[in-house]
Amino acid sequence: MAESLLIDVIVSLPLNKSYTYKTPKSLKIGSIVKVPFGHNNEKINAVTISNGYKKKTNYLVKNISSIENEIGIFSSKQIKFFKWISEYYLISLPKIFHSIIPKNILNIVSSEDHLINNNILSSQNYKTKLIVEFSDNYLKYLRKEIKFDKKNNFQYLILAPNILGSFEIFYSLKKIYKEKCSLYNSKISDKEKQKIWKNVFKSNNNIIVGVKSAIFLPFNFISKIIVIDEHDHLYKESDRILR
């Protein structure tokens, strides 16, 4: 019988620490598992944040209950990015996770979702293009940069420095691209955030307009990231409560 491995997970509860469980096999970082939690061993969803490892422990380690989604909705690079944010802001990783990820997101992504978050952006050669005179003609520029065809299901992320700006851009593009365009900022409801997260993961949403928090969405086929007023200080997070 193969020896069990240990994995570290973040549970779907607003707790500021990670937990360790046993798993019968190695799991991909970002996989969703169900684990027994607390004295009552209530089964809740969790996301793996480490590869399987072996380590002697002087305390009881529970086994995971089941593997809900081995493909997961977070790539290992996303988890690595979350860890970097945790170290940079000196905030616990679970707190980073829960401040960035919509509530109950682990509960709405089932094993039927078979798309892999390949982090396409990092595997391609992208060039930075600075638009110096980005005036009232921004809509004309955006329409020029956004291109769709039947063969490619490209996604576009348009970032604005503030919520008001994201609304203005969204309403302008919504008139043109209809259901292909979605808005993501702190003013939309948790239910809407869950819907957008899942649609982006499935590549159903092609254009996302939002503030800086939108960069954490699970894009699969992102083609371009367009940053409006990239010099704006609001892109720099100065508050330890991430938004």
Show where each model-derived region lies.
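Accessory, non-ATPase domains that flank or precede helicase/AAA+ motor cores in DNA-metabolism machines
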Residues: M1-R243
